[in-house]
A protein has these predicted regions:
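N-terminal low-complexity, intrinsically disordered segments
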Residues: 180-182
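Short, glycine-/small- and polar/acidic-enriched structural segments
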Residues: 5-148, 153-158, 162-169, 184-189, ...
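Extended ligand-binding regions for polar small-molecule ligands
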Residues: 32-36, 197-209
Length: 209
């Protein structure tokens, strides 16, 4: 190890998912040496099973990527996590519902009577209930199953599920790459209130001090 390497501040940055287009800037900065120029030795890691936010809050990672809606639930609890959002990754919320083309789920009400893969997050489910019922559908008639999916287009093609919440920049583009015909609607197009910043970069509160 050179003396210059020893002078670099070691940073662990935890992703929210497998590496994808939402993380492009992190890897570009690494490849172009921007971290080193800033005096940083950044290790980018994938999240543990219990998530990036917990890893960041525990101090195992100084920074992480997290969805703002998930983060809100982590802060609004009896034991809020010691994390703070410090930057937005995208200017607009590009998340929405991906489904098989022609299944009628190109609008929220089309999810009525269909199967949706859920993380069982309170804000996730409240968002879906709002957009589905507001569009004339019935959220109570949506069949909820656990979301253990890593390849969304493949899962739809195999009829493992009917609808999945994805970021278009990854799930939607991935469907095009895999040539899987899909329908998609953005939450921000259904109601502008859902055009919040997500994902965001979060930091460990003790590290920030």
């Amino acid at each position: 190890t050179s003396s210059s390497d020893k002078d670099l501040t070691k940073i662990t940055f935890c992703l929210d998912w497998t590496p994808n287009t939402n993380h492009t800037g992190l890897y570009v900065a690494q490849q172009l040496g921007y971290y080193e120029q800033a005096g940083l030795d950044v290790q980018i890691v994938q999240p543990p099973e219990d998530g990036a936010a917990l890893m960041c809050a525990s101090g195992q990672a100084q920074f992480a990527i997290e969805a703002q809606d998930t983060m809100a639930a982590s802060l609004d609890s009896d034991n809020p996590l010691g994390i703070t959002a410090v930057a937005a990754v995208l200017q607009h919320n590009t998340s929405g519902i991906l489904s098989r083309q022609g299944d009628g789920i190109d609008t929220p009400k089309g999810m009525t009577g269909k199967t949706y893969s859920t993380w069982e997050s309170p804000i996730e489910l409240a968002t879906l209930k709002t957009v589905i019922n507001g569009d004339g559908g019935d959220f109570d008639k949506v069949n909820l199953i656990p979301n253990d999916i890593t390849d969304e287009p493949a899962a739809l093609a195999a009829h493992q599920t009917d609808a999945i919440w994805v970021f278009y920049g990854w799930g939607g583009i991935n469907a095009n790459v895999e040539k899987t015909p899909c329908d998609f609607f953005f939450f921000k197009d259904v109601n502008p209130v859902f055009d919040y910043y997500t994902p965001v970069i979060i930091a460990n509160n003790e590290f920030l001090q």
